[in-house]
Regions:
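Helix-centered, glycine/charged polyanion-binding patches within enzymatic domains
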Residues: 101-156, 160, 166-167, 172-175
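Mobile genetic element proteins and their domesticated derivatives, centered on retroelements
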Residues: 13, 42, 58, 63, ...
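C-terminal domain-tail junction helix/linker
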Residues: 141-143, 152-215
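A short, conserved beta-strand element enriched in hydrophobic/aromatic residues
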Residues: 55-74
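Two-metal-ion RNase H-like nuclease active-site motif
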Residues: 35-48
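Active-site beta-loop-alpha junctions of metal-dependent nucleic acid enzymes
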Residues: 19, 68-90
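Short, basic alpha-helical nucleic acid-contact segments in DNA-binding proteins
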Residues: 6-8, 15-37
Length: 215
């Protein structure tokens, strides 16, 4: 925008994120290649408006976020609700599920995915625990979330963008990383164009008006 001489306020960007963020995230999820067959699941405390909430998050063996859900409880009913979201997001049932020893996970596992391996061994769930760190950083930067709806919208949208650029830099060469990053950037720019969020102004009336001779 700045390169085109367009001045935008912070409030405009915030309103655009509210309006177009969920649509943008849905488009990215459709383009995603799918998740792995091992889910690492964990929940953390999040305080919103003085009330305690639980942020449930699941990542696969590649570090991609499979699902994020904010709930008031962490009982068996809440666990089953989160597991159902994960099954809708993935193309098939996971081969292995790694959690801590919270009993709610056992309830959801027995009723929804009994054929999957349920691993509750110590230190096995470190990947899910580490995935909460970026959320804590953003939570401090935003001076805590203002509402559950805002938190759910922000975290779901950010997860879709994170998956797009989670390329596994430590596993590939610099040449391949540049190629994959270029593809991710092209997709990131292409999705807003398809949604009508961004319209390149080369042929817009503004540009035509600027080039019209003055009378």
């Amino acid at each position: 925008m700045a390169e085109r001489g367009i001045r935008i306020s912070y409030e405009s960007i915030r309103l655009w994120c509210i309006k177009f963020g969920p649509k943008y995230a849905r488009r990215l999820r459709r383009r995603h290649n799918g998740c792995g067959d091992t889910f690492f699941i964990d929940e953390v405390f999040v305080k919103i408006q003085g009330r305690q909430h639980y942020l449930w998050r699941a990542v696969d063996q590649d570090g991609d976020v499979v699902g994020v859900l904010l709930q008031r409880r962490r009982d068996g009913k809440a666990a089953k609700r989160f597991f159902k979201q994960l099954l809708r997001a993935s193309s098939s049932e996971p081969r292995r599920i790694v959690t801590d020893k919270l009993r709610s996970y056992g309830v959801a596992h027995r009723e929804l995915v009994p054929d999957s391996i349920h691993d509750t061994s110590q230190y096995a769930n470190y990947r899910a625990e580490l995935s909460h760190q970026p959320t804590r950083v953003r939570e401090r930067g935003m001076r805590r979330f203002k509402s559950t709806h805002q938190a759910q919208r922000f975290l779901s949208t950010h997860a879709a963008v994170y998956n797009l650029f989670n390329l596994g830099r430590h596993l590939i060469s610099a040449q391949h990383y540049r190629v994959f990053r270029a593809r991710s950037l092209a997709l990131a720019y292409n999705v807003p164009l398809r949604l009508g969020i961004v319209r390149w102004p080369n042929k817009s009336r503004i540009y035509r008006k600027l080039h019209e001779p003055r009378s």
